[in-house]
Amino acid sequence: MNIQETVLNILEDITGTDEVVNNQDIQLFEEGLLDSLATVQLLVEIEGQLGIQVPVSDFDREVWGTPKQIIQQVEALQ
């Protein structure tokens, strides 16, 4: 499984909707699909499944706001 598939699977599990797969430009925070607790869960899952550590201090909702942006950020950190 590649980074994109893994991140989308993680997001689908955390948000409980496949909308994150079908619309990768959806604003996760504005739509109420992610909150601060879900964000921590997302970062833990990314580290656990991909071995990529994302410091919480580097997490900015403006840059990590959509599934597409999250995939780009994770790929940049690998």
Curated annotation (Swiss-Prot):
Q: Looking at the keywords, is tRNA-binding present?
A: no
Q: According to its UniProt record, in which pathway does this protein act?
A: Cell wall biogenesis; lipoteichoic acid biosynthesis
What kind of modification does the protein receive after translation?
4'-phosphopantetheine is transferred from CoA to a specific serine of apo-DCP.
Instruction: Report if keyword Kinase is assigned.
Output: no
Q: What is its main location?
A: cytoplasm
Q: Which PROSITE patterns match?
A: CARRIER
Where is each Carrier domain found? Answer: 1-78
Q: What does this protein do?
A: Carrier protein involved in the D-alanylation of lipoteichoic acid (LTA). The loading of thioester-linked D-alanine onto DltC is catalyzed by D-alanine--D-alanyl carrier protein ligase DltA. The DltC-carried D-alanyl group is further transferred to cell membrane phosphatidylglycerol (PG) by forming an ester bond, probably catalyzed by DltD. D-alanylation of LTA plays an important role in modulating the properties of the cell wall in Gram-positive bacteria, influencing the net charge of the cell wall.
This protein's name: D-alanyl carrier protein
Q: What species does this protein belong to?
A: Enterococcus faecalis (strain ATCC 700802 / V583)
